[in-house]
Amino acid sequence: MGQKVHPHGLRVGVIKDWDAKWYANSQNFADNLIEDDKIRKFVKKRSYSAGIAKIEIERTAKRVKINIHTGKPGMIIGKGGKGIEELKSEILKMIKEKNVIINIVEVKRPETDAQLMAENVAQQLEKRISFRRAMKQTIQRAMRSGAKGVKTACSGRLGGAEIARTEQYHEGTIPLQTLRADIDYGFAEADTTYGKIGVKVWLYKGEVLPTKKVRTEEISQ
């Protein structure tokens, strides 16, 4: 059943880290969780064209730190940091804390980030580019950039067909049940004239934990 489990959720605490890093008591936990969801949805919607791969939120007693991983940092930062200040003021209206720190982290290789790959395919589908062409080109770019394996899947009324279906393409290996395998996963939706098309991307980058080696000791006489 490895096909049905989210690759990140299966590996959290093993080789993946949490996107939300904070602790709260039972009274504040639900409020913080709702705030995190609002922040993520707002930032994603506001800066969708900037190619946001991941949003990490860290909380302390009186501070909220937001790390935004993006392929186009200039679009969020703006001229002279104006974009950051506007984003900060808008987030402050949504949450209780008055001290918000926003860090922009550049994704050096967007072609090997599963979320950005999925969003790229979705944007091409919205421009009426063939789904087969979009998927195959995305796989080829990732493999040329050093990925060990890539799988893409598109679901919906592909090509305007009356009956919805799912089509998949893959290249290389994707060991979903190997916990030490660093598998990135991304999901995006394309809004087309025929309805929504879901895009999923699995990207295998290699094993994280080194293999155990038997130590050999030389016995000097």
From Swiss-Prot:
Read off the InterPro entries from this record. Answer: KH_dom (IPR004087), KH_dom-like_a/b (IPR015946), KH_dom_type_2 (IPR004044), KH_sf_prok-type (IPR009019), Ribosomal_S3_C_sf (IPR036419), Ribosomal_uS3_bac-typ (IPR005704), Ribosomal_uS3_C (IPR001351), Ribosomal_uS3_CS (IPR018280)
Q: Which family does it belong to?
A: Belongs to the universal ribosomal protein uS3 family.
Which superkingdom heads the taxonomic lineage of this protein's source?
Answer: Bacteria
Which keywords does this chain's UniProt record carry? Ribonucleoprotein, Ribosomal protein, RNA-binding, rRNA-binding
Tell me which HAMAP family the record gives: Ribosomal_uS3_B (MF_01309_B)
Gene responsible for this protein: rpsC
Species this protein is from: Clostridium novyi (strain NT)
Q: What interactions and quaternary structure are annotated?
A: Part of the 30S ribosomal subunit. Forms a tight complex with proteins S10 and S14.
| CC annotations in GO | cytosolic small ribosomal subunit
KH type-2 domain location is 39-108
Q: Which Pfam family, any one of them, does this sequence belong to?
A: Ribosomal_S3_C
Q: What is the lineage of its organism?
A: Bacteria, Bacillati, Bacillota, Clostridia, Eubacteriales
**UniProt-recorded name of the protein:** Small ribosomal subunit protein uS3
Entry's Gene Ontology BP terms: translation
Q: Name one GO molecular function term.
A: mRNA binding
Cited function: Binds the lower part of the 30S subunit head. Binds mRNA in the 70S ribosome, positioning it for translation.
Q: Which SUPFAM superfamilies match?
A: Prokaryotic type KH domain (KH-domain type II), Ribosomal protein S3 C-terminal domain
Cited PANTHER family: 30S/40S RIBOSOMAL PROTEIN S3, SMALL RIBOSOMAL SUBUNIT PROTEIN US3C
